[in-house]
């Protein structure tokens, strides 16, 4: 037997305060553009999809930085350690030698920006040499076409299809006058002829206070359709 308070709460129209589960992230279907919808990967984020399609999610630089591309990262340390200590020592020596050789190759003065420098060290950490950069950030004598060709990235197939879609001519659809509008224009023409000023001040027919220019455009279109020659 429940108490009076419980029975009153059950009859009340106010819902009970239950625990609210976390809303699941809704996957929105891309319907605005058929080309993007056909190439959209729902397992990726919006920024990742835009990058894959060759587009930009934001015109400006993102404030929080960019997502690191881990596909190009080469791990030099093995995931599992070898069983034998001798093999481990040999692998460590090979890794150090590879790191030293890679550092030697990467230090190119023509690839380092002007005003910066890179320090090259040996296996013990001692400074071997300092490489000063000679790469200019902007060369005024450089050809503009070379700069554009260097900065432009290769267009993807999706971008080419979108550009082809955008370059299609737009077919202009002419507005057709309704039957009621034609009847209204016919009444105005029979009453005032080509005097658009009187049409403008006609309070009974021009109830929506259409301007003289608007009335003239409508009547010229109506005359052209009905084959009426202006006086």
From Swiss-Prot:
<dbReference type="GO" id="GO:0005730">
    <property type="term" value="C:nucleolus"/>
</dbReference>
<comment type="similarity">
    <text>Belongs to the NOP16 family.</text>
</comment>
<protein>
    <recommendedName>
        <fullName>Nucleolar protein 16</fullName>
    </recommendedName>
</protein>
<dbReference type="InterPro" id="IPR019002">
    <property type="entry name" value="Ribosome_biogenesis_Nop16"/>
</dbReference>
<comment type="subunit">
    <text>Component of the pre-66S ribosomal particle. Interacts with NOP7, RRP1 and RRP15.</text>
</comment>
<keyword id="KW-0687">Ribonucleoprotein</keyword>
<feature type="region of interest" description="Disordered">
    <location>
        <begin position="77"/>
        <end position="108"/>
    </location>
</feature>
<feature type="modified residue" description="Phosphoserine">
    <location>
        <position position="178"/>
    </location>
</feature>
<feature type="region of interest" description="Disordered">
    <location>
        <begin position="1"/>
        <end position="30"/>
    </location>
</feature>
<dbReference type="GO" id="GO:1990904">
    <property type="term" value="C:ribonucleoprotein complex"/>
</dbReference>
<feature type="compositionally biased region" description="Basic residues">
    <location>
        <begin position="1"/>
        <end position="10"/>
    </location>
</feature>
<keyword id="KW-0690">Ribosome biogenesis</keyword>
<keyword id="KW-0597">Phosphoprotein</keyword>
<dbReference type="GO" id="GO:0006364">
    <property type="term" value="P:rRNA processing"/>
</dbReference>
<feature type="compositionally biased region" description="Basic residues">
    <location>
        <begin position="17"/>
        <end position="27"/>
    </location>
</feature>
<comment type="function">
    <text>Involved in the biogenesis of the 60S ribosomal subunit.</text>
</comment>
<keyword id="KW-0539">Nucleus</keyword>
<dbReference type="Pfam" id="PF09420">
    <property type="entry name" value="Nop16"/>
</dbReference>
<dbReference type="GO" id="GO:0042273">
    <property type="term" value="P:ribosomal large subunit biogenesis"/>
</dbReference>
<feature type="compositionally biased region" description="Acidic residues">
    <location>
        <begin position="85"/>
        <end position="98"/>
    </location>
</feature>
<keyword id="KW-0698">rRNA processing</keyword>
């Amino acid at each position: 037997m429940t108490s009076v308070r419980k029975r009153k709460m059950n009859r009340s129209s106010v819902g009970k305060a239950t625990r609210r589960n976390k809303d699941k992230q809704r996957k929105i279907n891309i319907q605005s553009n058929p080309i993007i919808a056909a190439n959209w990967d729902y397992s990726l984020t919006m920024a990742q999809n835009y990058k894959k399609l060759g587009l930009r999610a934001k015109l400006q630089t993102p404030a929080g930085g960019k997502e690191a591309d881990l596909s190009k990262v080469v791990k030099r340390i093995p995931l599992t350690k070898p069983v034998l200590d001798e093999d481990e020592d040999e692998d460590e020596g090979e890794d150090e030698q590879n790191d030293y050789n890679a550092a030697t190759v990467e230090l190119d003065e023509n690839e380092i920006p002007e005003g910066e420098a890179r320090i090259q060290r040996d296996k013990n950490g001692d400074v071997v040499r300092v490489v000063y950069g000679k790469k200019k950030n902007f060369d005024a004598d450089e050809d503009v076409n070379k700069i554009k060709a260097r900065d432009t990235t290769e267009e993807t197939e999706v971008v080419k299809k979108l550009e082809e879609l955008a370059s299609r001519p737009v077919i202009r659809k002419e507005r057709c006058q309704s039957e009621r509008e034609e009847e209204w224009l016919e009444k105005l023409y029979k009453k005032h002829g080509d005097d658009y000023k009187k049409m403008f001040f006609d309070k009974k027919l021009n109830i929506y206070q259409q301007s003289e220019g608007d009335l003239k455009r409508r009547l010229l279109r109506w005359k052209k359709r009905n084959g009426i020659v202006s006086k």
